[in-house]
């Protein structure tokens, strides 16, 4: 019974470390996003201050025509375009980092399943060997697969397998959404073979 308790403690520690790791990773992604927003705001403020200095700067020559003295006004459309482009780039980076989370989670769960199987099988085989040497009067020793620990190991493996299956479905769903989003932005591409057929049918 103590071996079973140790095994479950080990499984629980693995799962808790995995959950803590992904929580920390999500927090770091959010912190990076906020830091990039702050940097964008600082750059925009510095840009505005430099433009105001340019506007206030006096002319070098005293005798200049009125058309040369006209100050340089910042185009608001250009400024809005630059800020929108920066926000779009940052949103794309964040989306890519969030898309990688389910795939990395699938890999970590697969590694956890493999390590749980390996350690559980070693534990079951060790216990069966100990019981067979201690009980020498028995005619036939049971297989390690028929032990209670093996049944618990199978249950833990099934739970991890279900978690990995759900994570794979989430990753596939996000990949489909990303492809659909890219197709919607790019628009339908004309088929060159169809264009050649139309040219062949046309009388001109």
UniProtKB/Swiss-Prot annotation:
Modified residues (Phosphoserine): 65
Region (Disordered): 172-204
Family annotation (InterPro entries): SPACDR
Keywords, comma-separated and alphabetical: Cytoplasmic vesicle, Differentiation, Phosphoprotein, Spermatogenesis
This protein's GO CC annotations: acrosomal vesicle
Subcellular location: Cytoplasmic vesicle, Secretory vesicle, Acrosome
GO biological process assignments: spermatid development
Ranges of biased composition (kind: Basic residues): 172-184
Primary subcellular site in the record, as a coarse category: cytoplasm
Highest rank taxon of the organism: Eukaryota
One Pfam family this sequence matches: DUF4703
Purpose of the protein: May play an important role in acrosome formation and nucleus shaping during spermiogenesis.
Name of the molecule in the record: Sperm acrosome developmental regulator
Encoding gene, per UniProt annotation: SPACDR
